[in-house]
Amino acid sequence: YVVLVKNRSSIYLAGPPLVKAAIGEDATDEELGGADLHATVTGLGEYLADNDAHAIAIARDLFEALPWDAVLPSGPAPLPVHDPEELMGIVPADERTPYDVREVIARIVDASRFLEFKAAYSTDTICGHASIDGHRVGIIGNNGPIQPTGSVKAAQFMQLCDQSGTPLVFLQNTTGYMVGSAAERAGAIKHGAKMIQAVANARVPKFTIVLGGSYGAGNYGMCGRGFDPRFIFAWPTARTAVMGGAQAAMVMEMVSRAKLARSG
């Protein structure tokens, strides 16, 4: 885990003088490898702090979130600050209606405390540490299709949780991995495979909750039935399929039209 401090932390292979001497480029420390760059663009940093005191507080929260002693919880766990009954109004009946999965997390974890992992990087995929009924867990949720950067983020988080023995909870609501020329150029297949490999190799207990849509390969990457979760819960309006109905109908129509065109 890497904690970076705004306007103070910098990571790069070569500093401004060497970059200027080697390739003639004028660049500042922040432009080459500042905290904001690594928190939002490269994904090198996991947590972005405002100052040194904030960085120490983040480190303390992280140490508290990891199950170092593997001791079962003693005594009652704190209830969520936000009322779980509000979940009925947060998760929409129409799976196509967007919502923020963080609002769901805030209503199921102890004290509504969620230490988000790479919060400013690839916000389509939400990862972080929390406790549920006193048990420390890692949570992965979706805010739409899984981008290539989201695949990298989720794969790293799963591997870290596996190393620390932290059980994983998956909150599925995705149309699958992002498609299109931009996604392909960004390495959708390569990075998506990393995510699927990570969930396949995770030895910790895995639990899956389908909140909305769960389509295509996204179902695999988010620990669908094929990857042996301890159980799968499904929201009453959840949908699981190879692809959405509208997309399937359009594909079949295009295939039929192409077949008719070939036959004259």
Report each predicted region and the residues it spans.
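Ligand-binding clefts of soluble mixed alpha/beta catalytic domains
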Residues: 1-264
